[in-house]
Amino acid sequence: MAWAETRSEHFSARHEERESRQAAEVLEMLEQAREELSAPIGTPGEEVAVVIHGAAAGLALAQPAFPVAYAVSAPAGRRYLAGWPGAREIHLLSPAVLARRASGVPGSLEMLLLAPVALYVQLLCGMRNPALPPPARPGSLRVAFRNAWLVAGIGQWLSGQTVHARPAIARRLREGGRPAFPPAPSDALLLGGSVLDLLASENGREAAVALALEPPAPTPRETVARAFPGRPATEVEGAWRSHLARLAGS
């Protein structure tokens, strides 16, 4: 297998030689995301490396947390685990692999192809929020697992994946049990963005971004309660379940 490198102004990508065109498209998408996210979150001070893998096995070898996250995720959301962010690099599956992973439901392919941006958002939030990875710091992985809905959710929401997740959310609600609030780690990939979407619709985009940039509270429910000041947790949960039902029914 021959590897090649493609560069843009702020990113570099290592990929199989045959993926050069797709790699250039990924970097173009990331450059646009960098510009759009510079105001609300900021930008890395250094170039971000992107490693594009042609198979999940290669990604798992490079990022051992990837297969663990896959095993934890609910079946409806596993196909959308498309990569893993580091402090200054993003590992992701190639666009061709992501296209093959897409299901037949509307929005599945679109959600998968936005995965590079979602991972970049997670990288940015880890840069700004020392309590969460990336990079992995003492205690941060434990906090991230407990708050996986927030880590995955901010990436899903800011990348634009949430609007495309609606059919997958509907499947999750049909086939799985009643989801926890906030979503459990198994549901983070699919349902995490819905919490941020609700918060933005009620308190504005700035409130949703701020939630991801502040150290989480001791428990996930306390973190959510802090984002909706003055409202009982049961009321916020009810609003979220109604919002989730609307997303699933759209």
Q: Can you describe what each PLM-predicted range is?
A:
Residues 178-250:
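Pan-zinc metallopeptidase signature
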Residues 18-72, 106, 113, 120, ...:
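Zn2+-dependent metallopeptidase catalytic core
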Residues 8, 45-47, 87:
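Extracytoplasmic
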Residues 38-53, 126, 131-137, 168-170, ...:
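Surface-exposed patches in mature extracellular/periplasmic domains of secreted proteins
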Residues 73-167:
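Zinc-dependent metallopeptidase catalytic helix centered on the HExxH motif
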Residues 17-31, 106-116, 145, 149, ...:
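Soluble non-cytosolic domains of exported or imported proteins
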Residues 4-22, 95-101:
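Acidic/histidine-rich, surface-exposed loop or edge segments in extracytoplasmic proteins
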Residues 34-41, 119-120, 124-132, 158-163, ...:
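Sec/Tat-exported extracytoplasmic proteins
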